[in-house]
């Protein structure tokens, strides 16, 4: 028989992969917006809450959309992610901003009236 394989040195386990959705120390970077400051702040706060609460981009987008539908009347659309393109039609109100590595595009399209 050949020599025994060498045992690997034991040390602390490697750190877990970064969960880029978590909102720790995220600063909002506004790219474009037609919203009032108050509405923009609501979008950022809803996004931070969604990033803390959920683990997928779709869940975060759903959280933001539902908050805006309930607060500012339907119909809002939301896209959340690190890499996407868009070409949209909107009704006067939209915002596009980053929280850390995550981009958020939120816009109103249509109404419930």
Where does each model-flagged region fall?
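Charged, amphipathic alpha-helical regulatory modules used
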Residues: 2-113
């Amino acid at each position: 028989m050949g020599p025994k394989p060498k045992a690997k040195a034991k040390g602390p386990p490697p750190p877990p992969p970064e969960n880029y959705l978590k909102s720790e120390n995220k600063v909002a970077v506004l790219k474009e917006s037609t919203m009032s400051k108050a509405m923009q702040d609501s979008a950022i706060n809803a996004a931070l809450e969604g990033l803390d609460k959920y683990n997928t981009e779709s869940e975060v987008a759903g959280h933001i959309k539902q908050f805006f539908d309930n607060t500012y009347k339907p119909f809002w659309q939301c896209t959340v992610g690190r890499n996407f393109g868009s070409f949209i039609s909107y009704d006067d109100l939209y915002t596009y901003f980053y929280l850390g590595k995550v981009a958020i595009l939120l816009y109103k399209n249509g109404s419930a009236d």
